[in-house]
């Protein structure tokens, strides 16, 4: 307990400066720095970044720095077709990203765990709409952190039909582990895009959380959502001619720098893999869990064969 308090105080002190930073100005600057087309500088940026962060360019669709017109094209690079196989079980819920597990588990009293001893409110995270949050009360969640070195495209954990997308303005605090442990209610305060899909597990919320230096957030159906940075929420329904359907493992969006994805499922729909825990690395396409119906069917088979 004492160590937890000491670490929380340390991380809070280390995060204080972020309250004073011109977060949007710095993020806009990063947007420009990663999209210039000065060939020699782009090549230098890519080589230095790959060396410092240990990026494996061999698994990318294009492996040479010369193949990228600007740094952001490299940062959001596509991978080779065989680099991230999608778990072949029809009942598997797969990781939508490369990254690491920040937290994973059940919602308690409509709250999601942010860090040990800290939680935040489901309704606030989803934009203040009680009706939007209602199906997820008592459900399951997984928070996945993408560091700068990770592959930055976001994919579908299940096949789904997009129901709605909501942009929510907010701060742009870092989402690094130390900041998550040092700034209370961070994910419900930061800029984010809430996407709700209809899936075979019921509704699925995928929350794309912005952060400082995240030059922009994109989805495959709406394109670049930020910038420009807005001061008011923006809500869009996708019905009729606007209907969007995506397969499991299909790309749904991307971060143009590192950030966080939060998955939220209704109660009694998903069983997480037992070995998963906080700080564990994951790769896009690997199974995170299994649909409850599939778990129940397997148990019934075991009893029948006993």
From Swiss-Prot:
<feature type="active site" description="Charge relay system; for autoendoproteolytic cleavage activity">
    <location>
        <position position="259"/>
    </location>
</feature>
<feature type="active site" description="Charge relay system; for autoendoproteolytic cleavage activity">
    <location>
        <position position="155"/>
    </location>
</feature>
<dbReference type="InterPro" id="IPR003817">
    <property type="entry name" value="PS_Dcarbxylase"/>
</dbReference>
<keyword id="KW-0444">Lipid biosynthesis</keyword>
<keyword id="KW-1003">Cell membrane</keyword>
<dbReference type="InterPro" id="IPR033177">
    <property type="entry name" value="PSD-B"/>
</dbReference>
<comment type="pathway">
    <text>Phospholipid metabolism; phosphatidylethanolamine biosynthesis; phosphatidylethanolamine from CDP-diacylglycerol: step 2/2.</text>
</comment>
<comment type="subunit">
    <text>Heterodimer of a large membrane-associated beta subunit and a small pyruvoyl-containing alpha subunit.</text>
</comment>
<dbReference type="Pfam" id="PF02666">
    <property type="entry name" value="PS_Dcarbxylase"/>
</dbReference>
<comment type="function">
    <text>Catalyzes the formation of phosphatidylethanolamine (PtdEtn) from phosphatidylserine (PtdSer).</text>
</comment>
<dbReference type="GO" id="GO:0004609">
    <property type="term" value="F:phosphatidylserine decarboxylase activity"/>
</dbReference>
<keyword id="KW-0865">Zymogen</keyword>
<keyword id="KW-0594">Phospholipid biosynthesis</keyword>
<feature type="active site" description="Charge relay system; for autoendoproteolytic cleavage activity">
    <location>
        <position position="98"/>
    </location>
</feature>
<protein>
    <recommendedName>
        <fullName>Phosphatidylserine decarboxylase proenzyme</fullName>
        <ecNumber>4.1.1.65</ecNumber>
    </recommendedName>
</protein>
<feature type="site" description="Cleavage (non-hydrolytic); by autocatalysis">
    <location>
        <begin position="258"/>
        <end position="259"/>
    </location>
</feature>
<keyword id="KW-0670">Pyruvate</keyword>
<comment type="similarity">
    <text>Belongs to the phosphatidylserine decarboxylase family. PSD-B subfamily. Prokaryotic type I sub-subfamily.</text>
</comment>
<feature type="modified residue" description="Pyruvic acid (Ser); by autocatalysis">
    <location>
        <position position="259"/>
    </location>
</feature>
<keyword id="KW-1208">Phospholipid metabolism</keyword>
<keyword id="KW-0472">Membrane</keyword>
<keyword id="KW-0443">Lipid metabolism</keyword>
<dbReference type="GO" id="GO:0006646">
    <property type="term" value="P:phosphatidylethanolamine biosynthetic process"/>
</dbReference>
<dbReference type="GO" id="GO:0005886">
    <property type="term" value="C:plasma membrane"/>
</dbReference>
<keyword id="KW-0210">Decarboxylase</keyword>
<dbReference type="InterPro" id="IPR033178">
    <property type="entry name" value="PSD_type1_pro"/>
</dbReference>
<feature type="active site" description="Schiff-base intermediate with substrate; via pyruvic acid; for decarboxylase activity">
    <location>
        <position position="259"/>
    </location>
</feature>
<keyword id="KW-0456">Lyase</keyword>
